[in-house]
Amino acid sequence: MKIVIDLMGADHGVLPIIEGVSRALENKSFSAVLVGDKDKATPFISKELASKVEMIHTQDYIKMEEVATEAIKRKESSIYLGMDILKNGADALISAGHSGATMGLATLRLGRIKGVERPAICTLMPSVGKRPSVLLDAGANTDCKPEYLIDFALMGYEYAKSVLHYDSPKVGLLSNGEEDIKGNMLVKETHKMLKAYDFFYGNVEGSDIFKGVVDVVVCDGFMGNVVLKTTEGVASAIGSIFKDEIKSSFKSKMGALMLKNAFDILKQKTDYAEYGGAPLLGVNKSVIISHGKSNARAIECAIYQAISAVESQVCLRITKAFESLKPSVSVPQSDQQDA
């Protein structure tokens, strides 16, 4: 299995990415292709690691402040070269660089799966249950039609079933209430269409994402990104509050010591790094979009994520799902009249 890793554009430079690749190679068997500035990368690559990876040199990359359309023009940029390698035989690509450039090039260079109108970013959210919830779209499509959300539901369902091995995953539609009548026009129309699928649970509220009420939560990319960023902010704030309170007294420190195992589990469940990255579903190869601030652990987990996606043949499974399930979507006649 060949995995392409974009070295450029991340917040903390090439070192965390190289360390993540090195750790993953210690635990999994795969061929790594590193794309980026050789002069910046070489000082951090040991002789042992150098014998295990292929290095494709380029100094150009899409900076975070640049518009995503620049990636289409810059054929020597790291993400463009990486996407070309993926298109021409590699199995997966991971990038912690410009997410818009990654999404745009993936769609243009790899192509969309037949029947998919818009690819979506799929992310894992912490849950009180034993398994995380799947949320999509997490930011690829800010303005959506009901048909797009149907695509997201199908792709999320297949990802949960194939990659995460969830039995009979349930899909919920994010709304401002559980009742069928709740939601804006997009939610109401999507709800009518999703009724055609057995996996559809119904509307869910924001709090349900973390309760394990459903396995997959579907929403437009604007709302999904707000949910994602809010979750990250709340988790960070709670962590800071805990640290400050623990340091406030000897009694608190002793109590924290006794609860260390519980705190470790909490940290693991809420740490973005443990989830790796966010798969871009709906294109013809496996692409993982990692957080710009990714540390070595996040890159390592993103590689494991990519391996699982390739081994489960999730792209093929999504293709088959769209061939067999999507044509069955229709709004019930009574609902059409009501609308």
Curated annotation (Swiss-Prot):
Catalyzes the reversible formation of acyl-phosphate (acyl-PO(4)) from acyl-[acyl-carrier-protein] (acyl-ACP). This enzyme utilizes acyl-ACP as fatty acyl donor, but not acyl-CoA. It catalyses: a fatty acyl-[ACP] + phosphate = an acyl phosphate + holo-[ACP]. GO terms for molecular function: phosphate:acyl-[acyl carrier protein] acyltransferase activity. Pfam families: FA_synthesis. SUPFAM superfamilies: Isocitrate/Isopropylmalate dehydrogenase-like. It comes from Helicobacter pylori (strain Shi470). Homodimer. Probably interacts with PlsY. GO terms for biological process: fatty acid biosynthetic process; phospholipid biosynthetic process. Belongs to the PlsX family. Keywords: Cytoplasm, Lipid biosynthesis, Lipid metabolism, Phospholipid biosynthesis, Phospholipid metabolism, Transferase. Pathway: Lipid metabolism; phospholipid metabolism. Its EC number is 2.3.1.274. It is found in: Cytoplasm. This is Phosphate acyltransferase. It comes from the Bacteria. GO terms for cellular component: cytoplasm. The keyword Transferase applies.
